[in-house]
Amino acid sequence: DTINEWMAGDDLGAIHARVMGWQGDDSWLCKARDGFAHGSPLAASWIFRQLNQTQEATLEAVFESELILGCNIMRHPEFAEGVRALLVDKDRSPAWAYPDLASVPANIVDSFFTAPADMPVLGLPG
């Protein structure tokens, strides 16, 4: 029930406010809230868009979208910064490109959903 309450609607800012305002004591939900609080605002933006745009998609379309998104994520400096902060320096202090959800430009999020010219073809049966 809590997750459904958190995720209601199509406004990521409102969802973020509900999650951050939650005062429960469930350890799993606390970990999810803390991850959202400290994670990349850019990543939260493309994750939210991916979840919304593939809700009614075919499995083939979801896989294709995941491939496009994955190729673009790996090319973006935000991914390397997350790896650096968590696995390399282990300082857990990433310098995200955007400080909050409101500062993430829509055209940057859009760019994650455009296939790179050199992306491999998934070739699933249609």
Over which residues does each language-model region extend?
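C-terminal alpha-helix plus adjacent terminal tail
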Residues: 1-126
